[in-house]
Amino acid sequence: GVDLVSLGGTKIGALAAEAVIVTDISSSRGKALAEALSYLRKTSMQLASKMRFVSAQLNALFQDGAAVALANASHANSMATRLYQGISELAQMHPHISIPNRAEANAVFPILPAEITERLQQSYRFYLWNQATGQVRLMCSFDTSEQDVDGLLSKLEGLLRG
């Protein structure tokens, strides 16, 4: 089974909230994990003095059966799928790029030539995931629009054409 779940709140609409969820705090293992995480949070400077205000964002997103959180996450994932499909189509026409992994959540990891990455970064904010291979990390979130995705794909296609 799963002991921990990590939740990135910024991808679903929170300003600055992340969560680690212990799935079974009734077990001795779950209790030990929860205790260790509480201590780790303090020692790694992740305990804000007014944490309840940060946490309130997650509480709001997960009210009413988590409808808002699920809708926002689903949207982010669908935008990543759109981005993945577009880059996959470009990769079929341009041997200089590839996309080795499917988009399974809200992230896409294509491999681009360094000069394309540098020029694309002049218009879009993302970073190099693996310098040795040229793999970049492109993230979609609750507020990524179809126009955002299509704009990046259009820019990338233009750069590939030269």
Question: Model features per residue range: what roles?
Answer:
Residues 1-92, 98-107:
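Active-site C-terminal subdomain of aminotransferase-like
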